[in-house]
Amino acid sequence: MENKLIELIETYNDFPRKGIEFKDVLGIIQEPKIFKELILKMSSSQIIRNAEAIISIDARGFIFGSAISLEASKPMIVARKPGKLPGELSKKKYSLEYGENSLSIQKKCLQKYNSYAIVDDLLATGGTVSCVSKLLESNGKEVLGLLVVVELMKLKGRFKLKFPVESSITF
């Protein structure tokens, strides 16, 4: 399956900024059989099985997180960029490969579950995932691990994290 996935991922140089090599995973969801195979594989992870809930990161993480959530029969919580969630929020700033941003999670969602699997499309520097894990931990929650479709090994994001990382493809 790895070779099929690699074929479906397009690389865009200098996007969204000069010097960035953007890996576009959207080709995967255009191939339902491969997408389903990927979701079945990711859903069977011990990290997913042991978590009470899945937390997916804005925005491409939602695609994979929601499908995994359905397949694994686990609730999904979202971590969103500024101005996207109503209600009382838990917020945190983080650094990107190409700038700075922040993420928010609705506090009412965090009250329901104690252990989480983080799902995203891609792991680069680890800044976004680290932000989510710190948000969860600051609310007394446990991060069991991260599942991503793509991991950019040269950026060494996994080494900044204190929990297991499972990636379907590495570049």
Curated annotation (Swiss-Prot):
Major location (coarse) = cytoplasm
Q: What is a biological process (GO) this protein takes part in?
A: adenine salvage
Leader sequence segment: none
Q: Where in the cell is it found?
A: Cytoplasm
Which Gene Ontology terms of cellular component type are present? cytoplasm
Pathway entry: Purine metabolism; AMP biosynthesis via salvage pathway; AMP from adenine: step 1/1
Q: Looking at the keywords, is Acyltransferase present?
A: no
Q: Which reaction does it catalyse?
A: AMP + diphosphate = 5-phospho-alpha-D-ribose 1-diphosphate + adenine
Q: Which SUPFAM superfamilies match?
A: PRTase-like
Q: What class of enzyme is it?
A: transferase
- Quote the EC number: 2.4.2.7
* GO MF terms, alphabetically ordered: adenine binding; adenine phosphoribosyltransferase activity; AMP binding
Which keywords accompany this UniProt record?
A: Cytoplasm, Glycosyltransferase, Purine salvage, Transferase
Q: Relate the assembly described in the record.
A: Homodimer.
Q: What does this protein do?
A: Catalyzes a salvage reaction resulting in the formation of AMP, that is energically less costly than de novo synthesis.
Record's HAMAP family? Answer: Aden_phosphoribosyltr
The protein's matches in NCBIfam families, at most eight in alphabetical order, are given as:
PRK02304.1-5
Family of this protein:
Belongs to the purine/pyrimidine phosphoribosyltransferase family.
Protein name, UniProt field: Adenine phosphoribosyltransferase
Per the UniProt record, the source organism is Prochlorococcus marinus (strain MIT 9515)
Its organism's taxonomic lineage begins at: Bacteria, Bacillati, Cyanobacteriota, Cyanophyceae, Synechococcales
